[in-house]
Amino acid sequence: MAVRIEMPSVGLSFTPDSKESIPIAIVTGGEYDGERLYLNDDSKGGKKPKKKLSFAKAKIDKMRSRDRADLEMKLQEAFHKGVAPEHLLIEGDGVRELYEEMLEEVKKDTSVELPPESQFQLIPSPKKDVREIWYIAGPSGSGKSYIAKGLAERYRRMFPDRPVYLVSKLKEDETLDAMKGGPPRRLDVQKLVDNPLKDLDLLADSMIILDDYDTFTKPFDKAVQKLIDDIATMGRHSNTTMLCLSHYLSNYAKTRLLLCEATHFVLYPAATGNHALNYLLQTYLGFDKDETAAIRKIKSRWVCIHKNFPQWVVSEHSANLLHHE
């Protein structure tokens, strides 16, 4: 009888395993071009049996049920604590090898690496009744508009009857105006000042892009901030997906509500100061120091983090699950 180890209830795969599987990115370039990366969710139970790790060591196979149960519990505890195999304090022939096998199996389900010629492109949720808030933060020229353009084009492809709106200080935007299917519909900021949008149903079932919203000055800044706050708090009822592009990872009091409600964060670690990155990841995403350091070490221009359970991180060439238990 094999030792049974409880595995993560979610995993990453290029093949959906149920109707609940959600595509979170698509591959462009190379032999995997066009492949979708899915988040396969078994957290509701019953979709597939828990994985079972077999190990040939006779002393483990022949353990008494009580001893085997004790070993399972200890290995599971070590797994949850993130104990490395070389630091495992559980004694017994073959125990460390079993633990290493367990970690290797987990890694297969929770991380994906792409070859250099391929890269991930982010995509919005295909579910009609899901609203998302994407906070895309980085300095000028980092590629914020390019990310927003890709998301908006995918949104249009998924929902051809839904409009995409743009609020921008610029009269022309070379990147966003070049969207496939034509430029987004511009909302007149002066009208937002004169007649604040009182009914969010006017933006129901739509996507709205707020380009460098933090650059607006009086009297437009308050009108734009009110629009953002209203969508953040009430947009879930109208299925309004919002992309907020900003130069700042956090503007403290001004962004507190938005960051609390955001579902996705797109960051540019190499172009971001340590203090700002640490503050955002640890305050709003619950990262510890080691996880924060790991984000900075990712070799990618951008990194996208899904805030809610299960947390995942996607960059240009890799994807990883975090806090998936």
Residue ranges and their predicted role:
Residues 163-169:
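Conserved RecA-like ASCE P-loop NTPase motor core of nucleic-acid helicases/translocases
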Residues 121-131:
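Phosphate-binding P-loop
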Residues 132-154, 169-171, 185-287:
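Conserved P-loop NTPase motor cores
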Residues 153-163:
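Post-Walker A helix-loop "phosphate-sensing" segment adjacent to the P-loop in P-loop NTPases
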Residues 2-13, 180, 248-311:
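Conserved ATP-driven motor cores of ASCE-family P-loop NTPases powering translocation/secretion/packaging/pilus
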Residues 311-325:
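C-terminal helix/juxtamembrane-tail motif
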Residues 175-193, 319-321:
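Active-site regions of enzymes building and remodeling cell-envelope glycoconjugates
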Residues 4-122:
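N-terminal pre-Walker A segment at the start of P-loop NTPase domains
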